[in-house]
UniProtKB/Swiss-Prot annotation:
The gene is capB. Pathway: Capsule biogenesis; capsule polysaccharide biosynthesis. Disulfide bonds: none annotated. This is Capsule biosynthesis protein CapB. Induction: Capsule synthesis is transcriptionally regulated by AtxA, AcpA and AcpB. Gene3D superfamilies: Mur-like, catalytic domain (3.40.1190.10). The chain crosses the membrane at residues 65-85. The keyword Transmembrane applies. It comes from Bacillus anthracis. Essential for the synthesis of the polyglutamate capsule of B.anthracis which is one of the principal virulence factors during anthrax infection. May form a polyglutamyl synthetase complex together with proteins CapA and CapC. It is a single-pass membrane protein. Keywords: Capsule biogenesis/degradation, Cell membrane, Membrane, Plasmid, Transmembrane, Transmembrane helix, Virulence. Its main location: membrane.
Length: 464
């Protein structure tokens, strides 16, 4: 073997793509069997036998080649055996948890996950909930303390679901409520069919987001979400243009469809929450309760007892103590539908009458979103002042000059620092509603931090 010399000359982008796929699918030494023996064979073929690997002339002897194939064969057999064993262990753990719910969609998944967790827990099931995203949390029935999920350097990975299932099984949980963490359609299939095998699937909504992965159209997004529809179980979703499509897929899978009914959710009930809850959020949780045979009274009580997500929407009082301004952080709701929906809730509570200031944060790498907001959002919010911050604000300026944005004043503060923006706004921050929209990253994050520093009475913050 001393004369064998192997040199990899994979093209850089190809190597990254292969290694990323292997990292995604084989994270934590899990699921080798999931990918199938074909992929394993191809991987080793690429590594040792393909045109992308050069074997020096000295190593081309028959003996060296046989030794190499033998080692590859041993490693492959070991990985397959380990993968099968791990798969069986994982399946045994899943089978020990009778209620498994998978929540998918674009907006509001975390809130719906928490509401459902609260409902099932209130019904006296030993319940474990899991939210994903930047504030991923584990929620347990036996304590009010939530456990932040610590992720490795590679970031979120569907392989972490194995650890979640193991922990839930070790705790002898009776219900596992999980927010789907997969975005790519293939991974959504793996998440449902291998990782959680939910018997209740929830599709919160179908909106434009991650179109580079799930798109290019909403039809493809809806198709991707069909991975959430279980076999021989329940699908819970809302009224939408894709409802009939989801029903067809559910029928093929012998799954019962329950359509969330917003008429069962009163405004009085929604006002009891100390954070923003949309009617859809609550009606979806109520529909899951129906699927699980949980009575309505228990379901409503469980929703109210559910803990809010760290990123839950609130109206924050800040600036002047006697005549405060009220801040609504909608920067992260980066699509027109969600942004306008939040504003509708603000209007329901009467805040839209407080001489609104709308702050539009623009990014140079999201010009298409800036143009979309100039066309589909800002014309429909009656603001007294519209402020453009960040970079590449030209689409907003152009829309204002054309008369498309109905506002008394327009401030183009492109490139201004956070302190300069606050100084410019400060004389106007009395008895006003301030609504941030567009993009969370860039100029918005430090502005939010500065506003939070001026928050008046954290416990007195009004919620929507």
């Amino acid at each position: 073997m001393k004369n064998i010399k192997i040199v990899r000359i994979l093209k850089h982008d190809e190597a990254i793509r292969i290694e990323h796929r292997i990292s995604e699918l084989y994270s934590d030494e899990f699921g080798v069997v999931y990918a199938g023996n074909h992929l394993i064979f191809n991987w080793y073929q690429r590594l040792y036998l393909s045109r992308n690997i050069l074997i020096s002339k000295k190593s081309k002897s028959r003996k060296g080649l046989i030794q190499m194939i033998f080692i590859i064969g041993i490693c492959t057999v070991f990985l397959i055996i380990y993968g099968i064993w791990e798969q069986r262990c994982h399946q045994k753990r899943l089978n020990s948890i009778p209620i498994r719910v998978n929540i998918n969609g674009i907006r509001g998944k975390s809130t719906v996950t928490r509401l459902i967790t609260g409902v099932v827990q209130e019904a006296k099931y030993k319940t474990v909930g899991k939210t994903t995203g930047t504030s991923a949390r584990m929620i347990y029935w036996f304590t009010d303390e939530e456990q932040p999920i610590k992720r490795r350097k590679e970031g979120p990975n569907i392989g972490e679901q194995r650890r979640v299932v193991k922990e839930a099984a070790d705790l002898e949980a009776e219900a596992l409520i999980c927010e789907c963490m997969a975005v790519q359609p293939d991974y959504q299939i793996i998440f449902q069919n291998k990782m959680i095998q939910a018997n209740v699937g929830v599709i919160v909504n179908v909106l434009e987001d991650h179109m580079d992965v799930m798109g290019p159209t909403l039809d493809e997004v809806a198709e991707a979400f069909t991975a959430t529809i279980p076999y021989n179980g329940h699908l819970v979703t809302i009224e939408s243009e894709y409802l009939d499509y989801f029903k067809e897929v559910a029928e093929e899978r012998n799954t019962k469809v329950i359509v969330a009914d917003n008429s069962r959710i009163s405004e009085e009930f929604l006002r009891k929450f100390d954070y923003m809850v949309f009617p859809d959020n609550a009606s979806l949780a109520l529909a899951v309760a129906e699927a699980l045979g949980i009575d309505e009274e228990t379901a409503f009580r469980g929703m109210l007892n559910a803990h809010p997500d760290p990123g839950a929407m609130r109206i924050t009082r800040f600036a002047d103590q006697s005549k405060p301004a009220f801040f609504v952080n909608g920067f992260a709701a980066n699509d027109p539908s969600s942004t306008l929906r939040i504003w509708e809730r603000v209007d329901d509570f009467g805040y839209s009458n407080l001489a609104p200031i709308v702050i539009m944060n623009c990014r140079p790498d999201r010009v298409d979103r800036t143009e979309q907001f100039a066309r589909d959002v800002l014309p429909y919010i009656k603001a007294e002042i519209v402020i453009a911050i960040g970079e590449t604000t030209a689409p907003i300026t152009s829309a204002f000059e054309k008369g498309d944005i109905p506002t008394q004043e327009y401030w183009n503060l492109e490139g201004w620092s956070t302190s300069e923006i606050m100084s410019r706004m400060r004389p106007y921050l009395k008895n006003r509603i301030v609504y941030g929209v567009g993009n969370i990253h860039g100029a918005a994050e430090p502005l939010i931090d500065m506003i939070m520093e001026e928050q008046i009475g954290k416990k007195q913050a009004k919620v929507i």
